Amino acid sequence: MSDSGEQNYGERESRSASRSGSAHGSGKSARHTPARSRSKEDSRRSRSKSRSRSESRSRSRRSSRRHYTRSRSRSRSHRRSRSRSYSRDYRRRHSHSHSPMSTRRRHVGNRANPDPNCCLGVFGLSLYTTERDLREVFSKYGPIADVSIVYDQQSRRSRGFAFVYFENVDDAKEAKERANGMELDGRRIRVDFSITKRPHTPTPGIYMGRPTYGSSRRRDYYDRGYDRGYDDRDYYSRSYRGGGGGGGGWRAAQDRDQIYRRRSPSPYYSRGGYRSRSRSRSYSPRRY
């Protein structure tokens, strides 16, 4: 009886110990579970915060890039629009000439049919023709105020055209009708009214006209060496630009002629040396 009681008492103690141990273990586990859950939640929160920060940074970078590209495109478009508007304004401003000569009437009549005046333009002259020769020819038609041959500034040679100033318009008309087409020094000259009344800036080139069949080969070769390819259609547009047509440029040409005659030798020479100018002058007026 005593043995069975002791055995039962031992079983009870072991059960109680196991219960207490299980209870103690369950208490420990119960104590440790909230700490672990808290650490997991903290790690999740930190991860979510880091993700949100990275996402916000990437979003801010994207937005800044978009804003930068938009601002650059806007600035470029603004610059382009400003440059276009500036170029348009510049074209509008400079489309019309602001020179004081543009508002004035520079020509008397048109190039095809100039109005009659006292100044005649003589074109297609030879290099050997002088102002004295022209005066002898045109003085038959009336009193002459002055005769001016236009010379090149660099070479000091005749540019192949001159201006004859009459005192009367009627005499100029008669001289134009009679002397136009006349052969002078082996050249068939052209005579017409001058359309300019003020001098122009000289341009390089010599108007020599068209040689006639009676001129010698040496003279043709000499004259062609200074010809710049002018034809009869350009005698207004090019010849007048170089000479100071019709009412102010003849004095400068006369001064240049005097200086050229005083300082430089005579241009009438040939390949063999100096050639005297004692040649017979003959001009044939136009037959009616």
Curated annotation (Swiss-Prot):
Example GO molecular function: identical protein binding
Modification Dimethylated arginine occurs at: R241
Keywords recorded for this protein, A-Z: Acetylation, Activator, Isopeptide bond, Methylation, mRNA processing, mRNA splicing, Nucleus, Phosphoprotein, Repressor, RNA-binding, Ubl conjugation
Record PTM Omega-N-methylarginine, positions in chain: R241
Protein's recorded name: Transformer-2 protein homolog beta
Linker: annotated span: 193-230
PTM annotation (Phosphoserine): residues: S2, S4, S14, S29, S83, S85, S87, S95, S97, S99, S215, S237
N-acetylserine PTM positions: S2
Crosslink site: Glycyl lysine isopeptide (Lys-Gly) (interchain with G-Cter in SUMO2): K197
Region described as Disordered: 1-114, 196-225, 242-288
GO biological process terms, semicolon-separated: cellular response to glucose stimulus; cerebral cortex regionalization; embryonic brain development; mRNA splicing, via spliceosome; positive regulation of mRNA splicing, via spliceosome; regulation of alternative mRNA splicing, via spliceosome; regulation of RNA splicing; RNA splicing, via transesterification reactions
Ranges of compositional bias, category Low complexity: 17-28
Residues modified to Asymmetric dimethylarginine: R241
Biological function: Sequence-specific RNA-binding protein which participates in the control of pre-mRNA splicing. Can either activate or suppress exon inclusion. Acts additively with RBMX to promote exon 7 inclusion of the survival motor neuron SMN2. Activates the splicing of MAPT/Tau exon 10. Alters pre-mRNA splicing patterns by antagonizing the effects of splicing regulators, like RBMX. Binds to the AG-rich SE2 domain in the SMN exon 7 RNA. Binds to pre-mRNA.
Compartment(s): Nucleus
Family: Belongs to the splicing factor SR family.
Originating species: Homo sapiens
Keyword Acetylation appears in the UniProt entry: yes
Subunit structure: Found in a pre-mRNA exonic splicing enhancer (ESE) complex with TRA2B/SFRS10, SNRNP70, SNRPA1 and SRRM1. Binds to A3 enhancer proteins SFRS4, SFRS5, SFRS6 and SFRS9. Interacts with CPSF6, RBMY1A1, RBMX, RNPS1 and phosphorylated SFRS13A. Interacts with SAFB/SAFB1. Interacts with ILDR1 (via C-terminus) and ILDR2.
Modifications the protein undergoes after translation, according to the UniProt entry: Phosphorylated in the RS domains. Dimethylation at Arg-241 is probably asymmetric.
Domain of life per record: Eukaryota
GO CC terms in record: nuclear inner membrane; nucleoplasm; nucleus; protein-containing complex; spliceosomal complex
Predominant cellular place of this UniProt entry's protein: nucleus
InterPro entries assigned: Nucleotide-bd_a/b_plait_sf (IPR012677), RBD_domain_sf (IPR035979), RBM (IPR050441), RRM_dom (IPR000504)
Residue positions, PTM Phosphothreonine: T33, T103, T201, T203
Domain named RRM: residues: 118-196
